């Protein structure tokens, strides 16, 4: 009877042992992998650090995966040390040959030689603007004509070079009297930052103010000369009037003397 009871206990204990083994929590629960290793010219976005999770590396922009290499890595457990780690990927990222051939070439500098801009004339009929000065390879001419009764009319080219200003004045009251003054100003302003005026701008203002002062001075001198002439004219007129008044008196006295002589002869 005793051996039969022992065999029955063993038969009942085996399923219970299997059940306990199945219900026992696994030893690997809660184990996670550290951050994966870095690969040159590639990035990785890890979605899960748990065991047996798989992730893939992605090559950066301008690079592509080399043929024969793999971007796959997996979180595995080292049973000897009971430590989880990522498998080493064989990925190698190389430059994309298609993008290398499509790289744009640097812009080349083109220099145009012997170009002389033609200034446009907006002056009234009968007035000739000043001629533009010759330009070199890297400089251009800026011509401005100042005509009495009109505004400043500049003719500008892409780069600042020589500036010429001519002022022509004509007098309609007196015949053939023309006063012309020319100023030539040279200013080297090849590269001027925006918002900064070149040196020729201030020189032009000085030249215009100088011409205005000279014209005012000439006008004052002419007015003074006319005033002096007008003051000298009345005395001459008075002398002529006195001479004219003296002539009849002399003629009257001479005729009286002749009459007296004739009367004396008759007597």
Swiss-Prot record:
Organ and tissue specificity: Expressed in neutrophils (at protein level). Expressed in fetal brain with higher expression in the hippocampus and cerebellum than in cortex and thalamus. Higher levels of soluble sIL-15RA form in comparison with membrane-bound forms is present in all brain structures. Isoforms 1, 3, 4, 5, 6, 7, 8 and 9: Widely expressed.
A single GO BP: negative regulation of neuron projection development
The entry's keywords: Cytoplasmic vesicle, Disulfide bond, Endoplasmic reticulum, Glycoprotein, Golgi apparatus, Membrane, Nucleus, Phosphoprotein, Receptor, Secreted, Signal, Sushi, Transmembrane, Transmembrane helix
Source domain of life: Eukaryota
GO MF: cytokine receptor activity; interleukin-15 receptor activity; protein kinase binding
Gene Ontology cellular-component terms listed: cell surface; cytoplasmic vesicle membrane; cytosol; endoplasmic reticulum membrane; endosome; extracellular region; Golgi membrane; intracellular membrane-bounded organelle
Lipid bilayer topology: Single-pass type I membrane protein
Alphabetical list of PROSITE patterns matching this protein: SUSHI
Polar residues biased stretches: 108-124, 152-165
Signal peptide, first to last residue: 1-30
UniProt name for this protein: Interleukin-15 receptor subunit alpha
Lineage: Eukaryota, Metazoa, Chordata, Craniata, Vertebrata
């Amino acid at each position: 009877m005793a051996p039969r009871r022992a065999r029955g206990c063993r038969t009942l204990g085996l399923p219970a042992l299997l059940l306990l083994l199945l219900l026992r929590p696994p030893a690997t629960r809660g184990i996670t992998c550290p951050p994966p290793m870095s690969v040159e010219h590639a990035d990785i976005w890890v979605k899960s650090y748990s065991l047996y999770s798989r992730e893939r590396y992605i090559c950066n922009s301008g690079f592509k995966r080399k043929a024969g290499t793999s971007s796959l890595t997996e979180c595995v457990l080292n049973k000897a040390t009971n430590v989880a780690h990522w498998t080493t990927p064989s990925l190698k990222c190389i430059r994309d040959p298609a993008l290398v051939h499509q790289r744009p070439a640097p812009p080349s500098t083109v220099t145009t030689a012997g170009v002389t801009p033609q200034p446009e004339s907006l002056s009234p009929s009968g007035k000739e603007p000043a001629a533009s000065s010759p330009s070199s390879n890297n400089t251009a001419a800026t011509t401005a004509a100042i005509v009495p009764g009109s505004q400043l009319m500049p003719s500008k080219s892409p780069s600042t070079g020589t500036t010429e200003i001519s002022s022509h004045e004509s007098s309609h009251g007196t015949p053939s009297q023309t006063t012309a003054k020319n100023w030539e100003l040279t200013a080297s302003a090849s590269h001027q930052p925006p918002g900064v005026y070149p040196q020729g701008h201030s020189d032009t203002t000085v030249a215009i103010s100088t011409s205005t002062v000279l014209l005012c001075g000439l006008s004052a001198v002419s007015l003074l000369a006319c005033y002096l002439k007008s003051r000298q004219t009345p005395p001459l007129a008075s002398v002529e009037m006195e001479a004219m008044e003296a002539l009849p008196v002399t003629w009257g006295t001479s005729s009286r003397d002749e009459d007296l002589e004739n009367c004396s002869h008759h007597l």
